[in-house]
Amino acid sequence: MKRFKNIAVYGGGSFGTSLAAIAARVCENVTLFLRDEEIAKEITDKKTNTKYLGNIKLPSNLQATTNLDKIKDFELIIIAVPSYAFDEAIKLLKTHISNDNILLIATKGFARNPTELFSDRLKTLLSNNPIAFLSGPNLAKDLAKGLPASATIASLDIDLANKISYNLSSEAFVASTINDVITLQVAGALKNIFAIKSGIDMAKEQGENAKATLIVSALKEIAILSKALGGMKNNMDILLEAGVVGDLVLTCYSRSSRNTKFGYEFGISKDKQKFLQEYKELVEGREAIKLVLELIERYDLDMPIVSSLGNVIR
């Protein structure tokens, strides 16, 4: 299988920088495209991104720039921006790329206004490019350090997914492939909601059994929403993928999970309403609850965990 001659990553946060490091370990020509000139210079000159990844050393061949003019020259473009910035990022990239650029979407969550999957939003915003999605149990700092990790790459074109996997996989990073883009996106969006529930359970000292019960119940709700949106066509194996159960377990029980931390602090707070009003950190699951409640109502779904959280977290 042919190797990509170059790989670009769009998004200079912790996850984007870490994915750029993954790519740079298997591809000589890798450039991270971002907006912050100071961070771009630091990555190029010092091989660090201290704002997001501390003093972790990045691969020596990794370059960074704020100039989007050359991004069209890269065979693969990995998009790693927050879900709220997705539309803006795609609209901007559209003016700088051609239909030949392969796009790998690493953003997790839902598109907004209206609430829908990113694969559906891309049909409107950018319909002609080859597209795949990446998701997995991938803590950014571990990826940046080159520690062992796995992920799942999904595309309606399984040959494309296999090609991307071949070009990103290494001894430390293994990417499996599937053609169910819907379930992978649903799992990536819902996991943060279930992580909030995990934190609340910890605060209530629900015990170890409750942890396993939550994972089972969460997988059921992932399947319910995925099927409603057209995924999981007679194939339950997708639930065993790194990008589904792997990502779910990590997000629910990692000490560094923002969503689990939020759930725990909410659970121990005396004044719940005051806590919600004063909590200023970004919590993806909190916003996702609102969006999934829309889908539950739209498709008349029975998803008790999400619904119960929606009653107490607004």
From Swiss-Prot:
NCBIfam families for the chain: PRK00094.1-2, PRK00094.1-4, PRK00094.2-5
Record gene name: gpsA
Main location: cytoplasm
A GO CC term assigned to this protein in UniProt: cytosol
Native organism: Rickettsia bellii (strain OSU 85-389)
Family: Belongs to the NAD-dependent glycerol-3-phosphate dehydrogenase family.
A GO biological-process term: carbohydrate metabolic process
EC number: 1.1.1.94
Task of the protein: Catalyzes the reduction of the glycolytic intermediate dihydroxyacetone phosphate (DHAP) to sn-glycerol 3-phosphate (G3P), the key precursor for phospholipid synthesis.
Reactions accelerated catalytically: sn-glycerol 3-phosphate + NAD(+) = dihydroxyacetone phosphate + NADH + H(+); sn-glycerol 3-phosphate + NADP(+) = dihydroxyacetone phosphate + NADPH + H(+)
Any Pfam family: NAD_Gly3P_dh_N
Pathway(s): Membrane lipid metabolism; glycerophospholipid metabolism
Compartment(s) where it occurs, according to its Swiss-Prot or TrEMBL record: Cytoplasm
Keyword Ribonucleoprotein among UniProt keywords: no
Annotated protein name in UniProt: Glycerol-3-phosphate dehydrogenase [NAD(P)+]
Alphabetized UniProt keyword annotations: Cytoplasm, Lipid biosynthesis, Lipid metabolism, NAD, NADP, Nucleotide-binding, Oxidoreductase, Phospholipid biosynthesis, Phospholipid metabolism
Location of the active site: K191 (proton acceptor)
Binding site residues for NADPH: S14, F15, R35, K108, A140, R258, L282, E284
